[in-house]
Curated annotation (Swiss-Prot):
Binding site for L-isoleucyl-5'-AMP: 583
Motif ('HIGH' region): 55-65
GO cellular-component term (any): cytosol
Coiled-coil ranges (or none): none
Short sequence motif named 'KMSKS' region, residue ranges: 624-628
Protein name: Isoleucine--tRNA ligase
GO biological process assignments: isoleucyl-tRNA aminoacylation
EC number(s) from the headed UniProt entry: 6.1.1.5
Co-factor remark: Binds 1 zinc ion per subunit.
Gene name in the database record: ileS
Domain remarks: IleRS has two distinct active sites: one for aminoacylation and one for editing. The misactivated valine is translocated from the active site to the editing site, which sterically excludes the correctly activated isoleucine. The single editing site contains two valyl binding pockets, one specific for each substrate (Val-AMP or Val-tRNA(Ile)).
Protein's organism: Hydrogenobaculum sp. (strain Y04AAS1)
């Protein structure tokens, strides 16, 4: 007789082969409008806000974008299954130099000169370019399975956004932290603009360092000779520099009051420098003195008719250079700080292209600063002032956009003063949108002080992020927020034509903001309209009474653009702080810091409760991905071959706080892991075709093995959910794979097959197992949904035939922890599982010895000890099923001792006949089958 039709073999339409690249497209169509439905469903629940750090609207998305957006999506979806009303509004950074450069490139191809084009027309082209890539990237992000308010993203070029930035400038001015100053800033001579600290990256650079002597004036020589017994030769101080091109801007020399300086004799002159300098190694010291005795001595510039003085400075360290640092306040921040102290105005004879101006010596005028290095060195050599030159490799700032070296250059710029006390700048506030109430909480603290204080109120993931941010805040200079470009939000300040006084009244900023937000052109109106059209009627200079004004031509730093997003995106909707900001670890000095500083400057508090950072993507060997190396992998190519869910699984497969490896072999391994997860879901569905949720048996009434798995899985699910909530996604992944592969596939599912297949539909034995299978399926699907979103939604569609009245989408469900436990049973099974390991090992040995071919052919004899005797007696009727053998006997035997339990275990040939239906060996048959099968046909 053929018993096949009497066996409950698995049945499901849930395919074994995922075919994700096609199936996901179907699911994406179903998700249209889902975000809006979720917001409606969760209305009134506690709000959870992840504020999106805006990617740049240029080019297609790369693997770093995918990592970033998927991590954000996982966080949001975890909040969804936790029961929150999740607010995620994607954004784009739309202004800035890269877009300008791309538009310029397109214009050049058409032989159109940008300079001949009206600024508002050029800005229109930039806007169109950004819009194009917003649309492209939006579709690519959607393909990753990211849920969000994609119909209403925020764009930094949106008129309302730009208008709010104008208000933020007003708040910063009102709070006394925004000022205009002539001071050195990072300057890219190729892009011809100032750059913020966050826009430079340090790279190794070869340069020529030089030792140069500066001759002391006779009067200063005499001062030294009165203190020291010196030969009658000219005295020179020695400076060491790696930037010879800054020598034309030299206005002084810094020394240290605490360093010991020495005099050495060389050729026809005496040299004065610090005792530890490499230059005086193995030279005889004629005399020595402390640095404080050098203050005020004067020297002659080596090639300019200019004298300078020696000034004490905390920036001079022993052991580096010569103990004397040449000071060019127009080309160095430390130089500027010391110069300011002693009344030295910044001097920079270099234009925006990095070429020396008419203020420089004739022999270098018109030269690029880097070209001038060799010319200056040669000049010093010929005039006898060069003592030594050598090549060095040092860390030097480069423009993060064009990758060229930048310089420090003093120019008039707008700054946010990080050490300025935040107090109301105005006697009164004329507009409710620019108020002073937030400032009261600051108690006259500076931005730096308040920012440092706020870092302790923020949760940092990983924790090292806090120290990184603190280090940057403690050492950063004032924030230069002005740029000399076209495509950005203008700094909306007017100057009196007659006396140059700026208009700083708050109502003027509000007036301009309203013009921007009421126009489809937004900030372009600044370039379209003249001053009278932009100013309130009858505006008068309070200083001189003039009615004629001129507009500021600089635009805002793009970091101010994105850093003020909290004010443009969150606060108008009543959200003072986002729950999470998440970006790459480079954003500590970028968006995180810009957001923190801008928020404190305007509102006196951090805009975020938590900051999560991720590492960067590298290839399988740990190398940085680059086109030149040929190791770049496109996320879109991965999706095409494997599907987005494999990419999403990759994101949690390693510790994302470190750099994450990606390559073909890694993707293949992940595809295998995905199959294990999918087969787990399929096993559950396949064995639930005749089950309904209402058939479920109460946990405490289940078969003891099912009861064990229910209690054990409840703990595992809580563990997994805890990993989610603590952002420990790689731990979630490894525990998930362990649970799926070992606890379910190798144990529970393996043991369960016999009971599921052989017992009647509707029987207690089958229903008990099915109750747990559905419990596993539902909880696994919900817990998988933040990561394997497409697969979870696909699985969920099959669950609707099992449980009535399920919500439309898996994401409309909440994870609810089970409070069921049975500690005694869990302890019993801990021991039984150890015994199972020993039994399976013994069976495998006998299979290799050809004693048995299949576990069902085995009879296992176990000799119990005192610890195991009661346990084996308690479960003796179930042990054969648990070990997947035909028979188990508790008796004396001469078998080998088990590794885990130390019990003697012997495997023999099972007694009796093989049941043709269940394949178990039994000693009694009824109507040609075993007694159990005879009752289940």
């Amino acid at each position: 007789m053929d018993y096949k039709d009497t066996i409950n073999l698995p049945k499901t339409d849930f395919p074994m082969k995922a075919n994700l690249s096609e199936k996901e497209l179907e699911i994406l169509k179903k998700w249209e409008g889902l975000y809006e439905k979720l917001r409606a469903q969760r209305k009134g629940k506690q709000l959870f806000v992840l504020h999106d750090g805006p990617p740049y609207a240029n080019g297609n998305i790369h693997i770093g974008h995918a990592l970033n957006k998927i991590l954000k999506d996982i966080i949001c979806k975890v909040a969804l299954i936790e029961g929150f009303d999740v607010d995620y509004k994607p954004g784009w950074d739309c202004h800035g130099l890269p877009i300008e450069q791309q538009v310029e490139k397109e214009l050049k191809a058409k032989k159109i000169n940008k300079e001949s084009m009206p600024k508002d027309e050029f800005r229109r082209l930039c806007r169109e370019y950004a819009s194009k890539f917003v649309s492209i990237q939006k579709e690519e992000f959607l393909r990753l399975g990211v849920l969000g308010d994609w119909e209403n993203p925020y764009l930094t070029m949106d008129p309302k956004y730009e208008a709010q930035e104008v208000r933020e400038i007003g708040r910063c001015l009102q709070n006394g932290v925004l000022y205009k100053g002539n001071k050195p800033v990072y300057w890219c001579i190729y892009d011809k603009t100032a750059e913020a600290e966050a826009e430079v990256e340090y790279k190794e650079k070869k340069d020529i360092s030089i030792y140069v002597r500066f001759e002391l004036l006779k009067q200063s020589e005499n001062v030294l000779r009165q203190k020291l017994d010196l030969p009658d030769k000219p005295i020179s101080i020695v400076i060491w520099t790696t930037t010879p091109w800054t020598l034309p801007a030299n206005l002084g020399v810094m020394s240290s009051e605490d360093i010991e300086y020495v005099v050495v004799e060389e050729d026809n002159y005496l040299l004065l420098l610090e005792k530890q300098s490499q230059y005086v190694k193995n030279k005889e010291f004629i005399a020595s003195l402390k640095g404080k005795e050098l203050t005020g001595l004067e020297y002659q510039h080596p090639f300019i008719e200019r004298t300078g003085k020696i000034y004490p400075s905390e920036f001079v360290e022993a052991g580096t250079g010569t103990g004397f640092v040449h000071m060019a306040p127009g080309h160095g921040m430390e130089d500027y700080i010391v110069g300011l102290r002693y009344g030295l105005e910044p001097f920079s004879p270099v234009d925006e292209s990095g070429r020396f101006t008419e203020e420089a010596p004739e022999f270098i005028r018109g030269l690029n600063v880097f070209e001038a290095n060799t010319v200056i060195i040669e000049h010093l050599k010929q005039t006898g002032f060069l003592l030594k030159e050598e090549e060095i490799l040092h860390s030097y700032p480069h423009c993060w956009r064009c990758k060229n070296p930048v310089i420090y250059r003093a120019t008039p710029q707008w700054f946010i003063g990080v050490d300025r006390a935040i107090t109301s700048h105005f006697a009164s506030c004329e507009d409710e949108k620019i108020d002073t109430s937030d400032v009261k909480k600051l108690q006259n603290k500076s931005i730096r002080e308040k920012a440092i204080e706020e870092t302790y109120n923020v949760k940092w993931v990983p924790k090292t992020g806090q120290n990184r941010m603190l280090s940057m805040l403690q050492n950063r200079p004032d924030w230069c927020i002005s740029r000399q470009r076209f495509w950005g939000v203008p700094i909306t300040i007017f100057y009196c034509k007659r006396c140059g006084e700026p208009l700083l009244e708050s109502h003027i900023f509000e007036h301009v903001a309203k013009i921007f937000e009421s126009s489809p052109y937004g900030a372009d109106e600044w370039f379209k309209k003249d001053e009278k059209e932009l100013l309130p009627p009858d505006t008068v200079c309070k200083k001189c009474g003039s009615k004629d004004f001129v507009k500021e031509t600089d635009i805002l730093d793009v970091w101010f653009d994105s850093g003020s997003s909290h004010a443009s995106v969150l606060r108008p909707r009543g959200i003072e702080k986002a729950d999470v900001y998440l970006e790459g670890s480079d954003q500590h000095r970028g968006w995180f810091q810009a957001s923190l500083l801008e928020s404190i400057a305007s509102y006196g508090e951090a805009p975020f409760k938590s900051v999560v950072t991720h590492g960067f993507t590298v290839d399988e060997k740990g190398h940085k991905m680059s086109k030149s190396q040929g190791n770049v992998i496109s996320p879109l190519e991965i999706i095409k071959e494997y599907g987005a869910d494999i990419l999403r699984l990759w994101v949690i497969s390693e510790d994302y706080t470190e750099d994450i490896k990606l390559g073909k072999s890694i993707l293949k391994r992940l595809a295998e892991d995905y199959k294990k997860i999918r087969n787990t879901l399929r096993y559950c569905l396949g064995n639930l075709y005749d089950f309904k949720y209402e058939f479920s048996i109460a946990p405490d009434k289940l078969h003891h093995f099912d009861r064990y798995m229910y209690a054990y899985a409840s703990k595992v699910f809580e563990e997994l959910f805890s990993f989610y909530k603590n952002y420990q996604y790689h731990r979630f992944y490894h525990r998930l794979m362990e649970f799926v592969s070992i606890d379910l596939s190798a144990l529970y599912f393996d043991v369960l097959k016999d009971r599921l297949y052989m017992y009647k539909s509707g029987s207690f034995e089958r229903l008990s197992a099915q109750t747990v299978l559905y419990f596993l399926l539902k909880n696994l699907t919900i817990l998988l949904s933040p990561v394997l979103s497409f697969t979870a939604e696909e699985t969920y569609s099959y669950m609707k035939s099992i449980e009535n009245h399920l919500p439309e989408s898996i994401f409309m469900n909440e994870y609810k922890a089970s409070d069921f436990t049975d500690e005694e049973l869990l302890k019993d099974y801990q021991k039984l599982l150890l015994l199972r390991k020993d039994v399976l090992k013994a069976i495998e040995i006998e299979r290799k010895n050809d004693i048995i071919k299949h576990p069902y052919e085995a009879r296992v004899v176990i000799k119990p000890n005192e610890e195991f005797y009661k346990l084996l007696e308690k479960y003796k009727d179930y042990l054969h099923s648990f070990f997947t053998v035909s028979q188990v006997e508790i008796a004396e035997n001469d078998g080998e001792e088990g590794e885990y339990t130390k019990l003697r275990i012997k495997v023999e040939k099972a007694k009796g006949e093989k049941c043709p239906r269940c394949w178990l060996y039994v000693e009694t048959m009824i109507n040609g089958v075993c007694p159990r099968c005879s009752q289940n046909i």
